[in-house]
């Protein structure tokens, strides 16, 4: 109802509700596992299962053998698939696991693939993977895995969006992220940046250009609902994303918009703003005065008086 009241009802209608939970417990049959059976009771068509990719987590967190961890991944996926559900397998800590033991991390993916997962999502759960590593690792995974891939990036190194876009360029068909980058620690990859980059710059349709025009409104709406301060410096949808302060910048934008803007603000539902400060020049003052005096020019004496 809230979305409908804002004219954003179509955003909800296009979603696929997905139940989310872990693989079965170690040394537990899938049919006897409470988590898996609860997921099935959700009656969602799609179920996301997460499992361990890192030897450290299998041995020290699950406290099971590496062999049992591989089995529980395959068994859990196969059990859900046998009930006619689509499985999205989230390979938790995949990149850390790959860097610690490449062969084992790939083996866990193959287990999920054998179980029948539709998509294998490579998760940078700790957010420590750099873009240079991302490309190399995804390419290697593609050489060994035939199932479609997804990406789940965290922003602990400040590169969650970059890593997500690299994965898409290399063939990932699903991007897991959050609007406004909400999430654990430093947040998840920000969909408010990923979506316009895909649709406007990379010629990859995520929600379509028409829907992208609602992006800022949706971002503000979510901030209100979450009761979280809206970051005005957010790329694309922040109030300062297209705000200009320096006199030379403003003069340039007024002459040729893209001289200091990478896209048109209205493409994402934002707007251009000129800020008045001690750095302002005549162009800034003219832009403000034209709201009341449409014909005023930079050489008008009034502009000089305001600057004084």
Role assignments for model-derived ranges:
Residues 1-12:
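Single conserved hydrophobic/aromatic residue that forms the stacking wall/gate
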Residues 14-21, 83-90, 145-155:
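Short beta-strand/loop segments at the ligand-binding rim of alpha/beta enzyme cores
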Residues 25, 66, 95-98, 102, ...:
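Hydrophobic alpha-helical scaffolding
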Residues 28-88, 92-147, 165-170:
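Alpha/beta enzyme core
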Residues 51-53, 170-187:
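Glycine-rich phosphate-binding active-site loops on the catalytic face of alpha/beta enzymes
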Residues 134, 186-193:
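Histidine/acidic-residue-rich catalytic or RNA/ligand-binding cores of hydrolases
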Residues 153-179:
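Small-aliphatic-rich amphipathic alpha-helix that forms the alpha element of a beta-alpha
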Residues 196, 202-308:
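A mid-to-C-terminal "edge-of-domain" accessory segment
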């Amino acid at each position: 109802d809230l979305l409908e009241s804002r004219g954003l009802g179509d955003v909800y209608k296009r979603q696929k509700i997905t139940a989310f939970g872990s693989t079965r417990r170690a040394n537990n049959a899938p049919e006897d596992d409470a988590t898996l059976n609860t997921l099935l009771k959700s009656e969602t068509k799609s179920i996301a299962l997460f499992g361990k990719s890192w030897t450290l987590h299998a041995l020290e967190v699950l406290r099971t053998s590496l062999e049992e961890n591989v089995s529980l991944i395959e068994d859990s996926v196969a059990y859900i698939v046998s009930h006619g559900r689509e499985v999205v397998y989230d390979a938790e800590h995949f990149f850390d696991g790959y860097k610690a033991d490449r062969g084992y991390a790939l083996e866990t993916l193959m287990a999920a693939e054998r179980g029948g997962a539709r998509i294998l999502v490579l998760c940078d759960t700790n957010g420590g993977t750099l873009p240079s590593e991302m490309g190399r690792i995804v390419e290697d995974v593609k050489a060994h895995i035939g199932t479609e891939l997804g990406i789940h990036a965290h922003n602990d190194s400040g590169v969650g969006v970059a890593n997500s876009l690299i994965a898409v360029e290399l063939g990932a068909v699903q991007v897991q992220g959050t609007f406004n980058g909400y999430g654990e620690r430093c947040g998840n990859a920000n969909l408010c940046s990923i979506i316009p980059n895909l649709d406007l710059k990379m010629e990859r349709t995520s929600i379509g250009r028409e829907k992208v025009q609602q992006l800022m409104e949706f971002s503000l709406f979510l901030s209100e609902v979450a009761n979280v301060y809206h970051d005005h410096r957010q790329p694309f949808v922040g109030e300062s994303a297209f705000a200009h302060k320096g006199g030379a910048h403003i003069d340039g934008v007024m002459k040729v918009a893209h001289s200091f803007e990478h896209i048109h603000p209205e493409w994402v539902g934002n707007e251009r703003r000129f800020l008045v400060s001690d750095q302002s020049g005549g162009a800034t003052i003219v832009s403000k005065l034209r709201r009341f005096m449409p014909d005023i020019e930079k050489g008008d004496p009034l502009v000089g008086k305001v600057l004084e």
